[in-house]
Amino acid sequence: MATFILEIGTEELPARFLLELQSELGVRFLDSLQSMGYRPTEVSDYSTPRRLVVCIKGLDMIQPHCEEVVIGPPINIAFDKDGNPTKAAEGFAKNLGITIGSLSQISTDRGEYISGLKVKGGIPTKEVLARLCPEIITALPLPKRMRWGNNPFTFIRPIRWIMALLDSDIVPFELAGIHSNRNTVGLRNNNVPFIEVPSSTDYYMLLKEVGNVILDPNSRKDSILQLGNKEAQLIGGVVNWNERLLNEVIGLVEHPYPLLGTINSVFLNLPREVLLTSIETHQKSFGILDSQGNLLPYFLTVLNMTPPDLALVKQGWERVLQARLEDARFFWNEDINSSFDEWQEKLTHLIFLDPLGSIAQKEHRVSLLCEWIAKYIPTSNAEEARKAGSLSKVDLVSKMVEEFPELQGVMGGIYARHKGESESIATAIAEQYLPSGPDTDVPVTDLGAILSIADKIDTLVGCFGCGIIPTGTADPYGLRRCALGIIRILIEKEYPINLHQLYTRAQDNFVNVSWKLAPEDVLQKLHEFIIARLKNYFLALGYDTLVVEAIVSTQTSQLWSIKDRLDSFILLSQHEDFSQLVQTIKRVINIIKKQDKETEIVLTGHWNPSLFKDTAEKVLAEKLMIAVNKFNQESQTASLPVFMMLLKLQPAINTFFDQVMIMSNDIEVRRNRLNLLKALLLYIESLADFSVLQI
């Protein structure tokens, strides 16, 4: 059995895309080879800043023989009425390389078709890989593409070399003007320009020992953690390992070498967030903490090699960071000597979106929304919420945020605290941009959550009104993130806020705005957009697609109750009588749907008990009223007992169908019975849309 290694050598790849790209490379090779009959024993993928690598073990040297059933044209097209093959059948057989007599008939969901066996295999694996490699590399899903030189080929970064070996044989192909060979490249600035690899089994050893490259990202991570912790222990501290930054640094180095640098103690007077932003975001380094979690005057950076002059490199890193911190100290001193009134005036000249006015106007709208939202949350104070909203954007014109945009909100909270605002208002301002992504927490405080909802819904309504609606992958204003943030807050904080009222209230706060879309169209499109995000949210949590569709389509205003509905519905679906219940409900749906289409009878769901003639319809009406009252007593939250009431209704529904002539000759009796079924359906649809279920 043979081992295949492919190494795509490039200019420095963006660190944030590395792990996804290496995984995609491995998955695509595995899927392609398995579809060709191969059964590799192991597929490994790796990446460094300058290479993507896949290693496949346990390959046959010759592609295994396998048969594939290929479906051709329908039987009535493949043969004429006399049973003679048509040109369609002849062409199909020719494409498969078989005779007409070898064709078979196969039954499918779409009817009767002809089929044939296509035999694959017998090709040398080296030839298979030579064709497969350029196909897979070209088809890799890349977040960005670029061209270089005169070649029309595009990739995420320029390709500089390609090594492709099947055991000791070169797998020959050409891509982007580069021919595959047996050469790899070591660490940049290494004395050896190219490393010849005799066989795929020699690759790892040569790359590490001669090239000085640690190929496996997990090994680089372990090395950084081990050596970094050791450096921090020398000065009695611990490294503040930021997982997101650590994963980025892993993608920036091929041979990690942690270096401990010092910070002038005078800078420790700066806010912790400012220090960490300067260290982590701008220098890609890590802070050092004492045993109490306070920052020490040190930082840890990770070099890409062992430097020839460690002291000189250390001095350079310290000088660059000190310049950053000097700027930060200057901005801090400038900001704390400025007033919020000055900043509020500057906000009037800072445009949010041209049709929507200034940031000052947005801040005012947000403050009004905060006051309105707070009234639905018993633990919050409406006046305090309005105050938090009115100060939410002042830090956008501060010197610190101009220099460090990622600190917006955070600095607003710090400045609010520094200028005497309450702790709750300061915390709310700091939390307003949470959650910043699907994996970050929602605001801890109710006031912060209120401010976050208000800010996000104002942005969504304003952008949709201007016709700025995300399409495809384009979302320059982060509207998907805004929608998901609102969804998560309402669900995780269990706030009883009606979505439609929230949209309308936000829209009403816009004054003298020329909308590109009609106001009612804005609300409709926005609601569809948020519901799509809502469904994706629950699918990501592992809920079944049809279950999500059944529940979400019936309850789109009170998001806080949807998770309980989903869980209750799942428990109901596990009952032994659930399948029969669904069939019964679908019968009700079909009867009402037919009446709506084929008759002029308008069904309202209101019935007249005096028109009941049979006991079965009286019993069904009584059972339905009990279920509806139970639902209303539960404040329409559709808990498990409410869903289980459907099972208690089922016998009455079945008896109604068995004993009652719905389509009575008496038009009034008929209308009354149909309205009873309509009322039943309206109640059922308030719980779930059973029509989407496939049972």
UniProtKB/Swiss-Prot annotation:
Belongs to the class-II aminoacyl-tRNA synthetase family. HAMAP family: Gly_tRNA_synth_beta. It is found in: Cytoplasm. Its EC number is 6.1.1.14. This is Glycine--tRNA ligase beta subunit. Keywords: Aminoacyl-tRNA synthetase, ATP-binding, Cytoplasm, Ligase, Nucleotide-binding, Protein biosynthesis. GO terms for biological process: arginyl-tRNA aminoacylation; glycyl-tRNA aminoacylation. GO terms for molecular function: arginine-tRNA ligase activity; ATP binding; glycine-tRNA ligase activity. It catalyses: tRNA(Gly) + glycine + ATP = glycyl-tRNA(Gly) + AMP + diphosphate. It comes from the Bacteria. It is an enzyme of class 6 (ligase). The keyword Cytoplasm applies. Its main location: cytoplasm. Tetramer of two alpha and two beta subunits. InterPro entries: DALR_anticod-bd, Gly-tRNA-synth_bsu, Gly-tRNA-synth_heterodimer.
